[in-house]
Amino acid sequence: MSTIFANIKYLLAPSLILVTLAGVIAGGMLSWIGVALLGVGVIVDTILRKQSSSSMHKEDGTTKASPTFQNLVMYMMLPVFVLLQLALAWRVYGFMTGVPVEITATWFGLIPVYSGITSLDLIGAVLSTGIFAGIGIIYGHELSHCKGFAFIISRMTMGLSGSAHFCYAHVYNHHLELASEDDPATAPRGRTIYGHYLLSYLGQSKFVFNMEKERLSRMGVSFISWQNRWIRGYLMAVPTVALFFMAGGWIGMAVLATVWGISNFELEALNYLEHYGLIRVKDQPIDYRHNWDNSTCFTAWFFIEIGRQADHHDRGETHFWELE
């Protein structure tokens, strides 16, 4: 039984993402379900202070979680997030073309499905999508520590939020320069979370820009090249941009900008909370004291153990279900 629980507890986020997707498709008041779920999550996490015991381990020290199952779930989140964006773009298109707001079907004889969407419910759909697209970034983060196929999935997942640069910046900058002035993802004391949002995003992008500039120069290759991973990362976002522009023109672009803004804010808010104000003398070893940890049950299960930052930075190659 404990082995089953060690695996299914991490299905909390995927389950709520699917509920949010269903809400955007159904329309009406259900378009706001992602916003409602966020509110419920904050309340539950505030009240439920019980500490999570990670995935628990067998007597031989191995984790009870199944690597195959957990990896499959992470890989499957990419098409789910693509569907979430498609559903929102479809809602934008219906709004822009004046599709009448009528009940055209019911699910399970109880849940109405609307053909069109009102401006108020479209706002709900945009906010809900942005909130749970941010959860996609969590899976992109986990897979960025892998190689090969998993890393490609990570880049594509982050590309859906216009942040494919993160995969390289996180591994080659944040994990090496943690809590120092050279790490844009570490917020120094006195910086607001809103200021950190922009400075961290742009700083990480600048790191990959410079990294590729130096790498390609050593290779004798032009910066404007298909071999430029900084450029390729942003090109991954082109299909998403094209989708929303075709769906609603500049309104579609505003919708996408809002979704990207929310999802990336969630990422940088996590960076802010995990390392705010911590200082490490450059070239000194990274220690557990250079991270703020949180292992309450809801945070651990919903954010797939991202709160176990100390162990994550100590053993960066370790999968989330193995962290202590």
Predicted regions and their residues:
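Cytosolic/stromal cytosol-facing helical appendages immediately following the last transmembrane segment
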Residues: 2-16, 20, 148-228, 262-324
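Alpha-helical bilayer-embedded segments of polytopic membrane proteins, i.e.
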Residues: 2-49, 65-91, 104-132, 226-268
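Juxtamembrane membrane-interface segments at transmembrane alpha-helix termini
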Residues: 43-55, 137-138, 164-167, 266-275
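Membrane-helix interface linkers and caps
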Residues: 48-62, 99-100
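Generic signal for short, ordered secondary-structure residues
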Residues: 58, 122, 152-153, 249, ...
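Alpha-helical transmembrane segments with an aromatic anchor "belt"
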Residues: 58-68, 284-288
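Intramembrane catalytic core of multi-pass membrane enzymes that act on lipidic substrates
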Residues: 62-201
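Short alpha-helical catalytic segment bearing the HExxH-like zincin motif
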Residues: 134-139, 256, 301, 305, ...
